[in-house]
């Protein structure tokens, strides 16, 4: 184990430097709070700034008359899986938080068309952001010029430390050594977990470390089975977001051998299927067009490297804003013409609708520990409306800092650095006897393959159980003290995903069980927590 060479102290520790983390940091700095920002890469990284997409939207409540309509749209796709108090907080605050994007270097604009967001039934204001490189440069300049913010780049969260149910600090790894950070409040903004999948639309380091450390610290996870899978390009270039709206002009889908995957449908039925699927991005079993994603994954399981889509020339004749932004970006930045190039797609892991359980202030079950952005389970449920992800990051990062300021004023940490060091050393002792027979690279590669095939759009008991057994074997043969904590956290979160998917024996929203294809009339959420030292999943009936 590396030595503890550094000790730092702050009012608020922010872990993560995407949109949620940066908003938390600048809002804390505005309150005069000494803030440390820890991130695995550089400031302004993570999924927020991933360049494999043209733009991001932020959907906000459009006046008092829209309040109940928006709430209904959210409820329609949440399917009883979300928290009404958190939804109300978003509906109230979202119109007033767009300016927070300017504070971290973006230049948002209001979209000009009246197209409803993905899954939404009603149109409302949608603000857009893009220009990821410029926004990243701006954010780094903003953080670098703040007298209240200290960045810890290329650093990883290893352990969250608590005392009597309150946050006291964390252990960070930087350059092979450990750093103790004592704080009065902590904001987790570590993002999602899509990097656990072989094909994903995220940077390569999002393994769910925030989820794993929060769970060990006493937090609960909820809705972890609900992961969004969005078609992404595997050719002509890999890991590029596919614009689902282009399916309106799709003329066919074939596997690698050229077999028509909808040969059993009439031409009019195929056309209707593509049109319906063009209205939403993430897979959902709530629509008849679910067979688009299911047959795509069946072809992949049978050996196809994605499926090929063909398009009519009228695709490029549609110059409405939603089409023009994507198609122009695709040609300009990626050199792809969807009517000329061979377009092959597969289901890519994207956002996690579940995460750390929070209240309407972003606070977890641990006092003073907050979770914001994708690491949290916010307004999402079984699925999420387009444009609510970034909006949720803005609303709850701001709310978290407002509440964190009270801990700065009220809470004096009674735990010394020496006590924190002893706690960490005692925790590490559990790994000393493990004889590590596999490396982090081997573990992560295996995890990604297991989840890609067994915990994707298609799920069933046998494949999930077999994958879980393999994860147990890997965990028993891996020592984080020898090969690092990334793979340790990845294994922990992958096991949570498998258990949650096994536990929900029904199909709902983003979760499809081929062996349980219908929805259960009973509505419940699955809560994951440690109880008496063991991982436990209980049902919280709504």
Which residues does each PLM region occupy?
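Conserved N-terminal glycine-rich FAD pyrophosphate-binding loop of Rossmann-like flavoproteins
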Residues: 41-66, 243
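Core beta-strand elements of the Rossmann-like FAD/NAD(P) dinucleotide-binding domain
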Residues: 7-10, 176-185, 365
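Conserved redox-cofactor binding core of oxidoreductases
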Residues: 94-177, 185, 189-190, 198, ...
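An anion/pyrophosphate-binding glycine-rich loop and adjacent beta-alpha core
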Residues: 43, 213, 220-336, 394, ...
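Glycine-rich active-site loop/strand segments that organize a redox cofactor
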Residues: 57-89
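Glycine-rich loop(s) and the adjacent beta-strand/alpha-helix scaffold that form part
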Residues: 185-240, 383-403
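Glycine- and aromatic-enriched mobile tails/lids
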Residues: 1-3, 8, 27, 33, ...
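N-terminal Rossmann-like FAD-binding beta1-loop-alpha1 element of flavoenzymes
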Residues: 12-37
């Amino acid at each position: 184990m590396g030595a503890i060479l550094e000790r730092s102290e702050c009012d608020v520790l922010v872990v993560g430097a995407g949109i949620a983390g940066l908003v938390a940091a600048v809002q804390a700095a505005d309150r005069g709070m000494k803030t440390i920002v820890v991130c695995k890469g550089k400031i302004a990284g993570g999924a927020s700034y991933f360049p494999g997409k043209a733009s991001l939207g932020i959907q906000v409540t459009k006046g008092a008359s829209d309040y109940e309509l928006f709430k209904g749209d959210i409820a329609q796709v949440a399917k009883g899986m979300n928290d009404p108090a958190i939804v109300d907080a978003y509906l109230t605050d979202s119109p007033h938080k767009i300016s927070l994007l300017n504070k971290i270097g973006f230049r948002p604009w209001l979209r000009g068309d009246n197209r409803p967001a993905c899954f939404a039934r009603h149109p409302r204001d949608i603000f857009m952001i893009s220009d990821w490189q410029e926004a990243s440069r701006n954010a780094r300049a903003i953080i670098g010029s703040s007298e209240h913010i200290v960045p810890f780049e290329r650093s990883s969260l290893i352990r969250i430390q608590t005392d009597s149910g309150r946050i006291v600090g964390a252990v960070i790894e930087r350059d092979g050594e450990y750093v103790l950070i004592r704080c009065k409040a902590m904001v987790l903004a570590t993002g999602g977990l899509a990097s656990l999948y072989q094909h994903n639309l995220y940077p390569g380091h999002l393994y769910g470390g925030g989820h794993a450390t929060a769970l060990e610290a006493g937090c609960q996870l909820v809705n972890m089975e609900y992961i969004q899978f969005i078609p992404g390009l595997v050719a002509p270039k890999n890991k590029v977001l596919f614009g689902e709206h282009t399916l309106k002009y799709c003329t066919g889908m074939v596997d690698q051998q050229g077999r028509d995957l909808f040969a059993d449908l009439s031409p009019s039925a195929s056309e209707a299927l593509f049109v319906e699927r063009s209205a939403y991005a993430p897979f959902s079993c709530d629509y008849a067009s679910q067979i688009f994603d299911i047959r795509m994954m069946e072809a992949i399981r049978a050996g196809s490297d994605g499926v090929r889509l063909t398009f009519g020339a009228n695709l490029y004749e549609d110059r409405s804003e939603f089409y023009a932004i994507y198609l122009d970006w695709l040609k300009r930045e990626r050199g792809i013409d969807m009517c000329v190039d061979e377009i092959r797609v597969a289901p890519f892991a994207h956002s996690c609708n579940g995460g750390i359980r929070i209240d309407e202030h972003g606070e977890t079950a641990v006092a003073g520990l907050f979770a914001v952005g994708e690491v949290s389970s916010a307004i999402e449920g079984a699925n999420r409306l387009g444009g609510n992800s970034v909006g949720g990051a803005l609303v709850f990062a701001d709310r978290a800092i407002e509440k964190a300021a009270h801990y700065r004023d009220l809470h004096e940490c009674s735990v010394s650095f020496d006590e924190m060091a002893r706690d960490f050393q005692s925790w590490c002792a559990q790994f000393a006897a493990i004889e590590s027979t596999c490396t982090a690279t081997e573990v992560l590669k295996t995890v990604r393959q297991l989840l890609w095939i067994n915990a994707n759009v298609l799920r069933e008991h046998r494949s999930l159980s077999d994958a879980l057994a393999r994860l147990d074997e890997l965990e028993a043969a891996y020592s984080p003290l020898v090969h690092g904590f990334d793979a340790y956290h990845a294994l922990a979160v992958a096991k949570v995903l498998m258990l949650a998917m096994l536990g929900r024996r029904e199909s709902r929203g983003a979760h499809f069980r081929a062996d349980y294809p219908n929805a259960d009339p009973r509505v419940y959420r699955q809560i994951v927590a440690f109880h008496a030292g063991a991982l436990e999943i209980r049902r919280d009936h709504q």
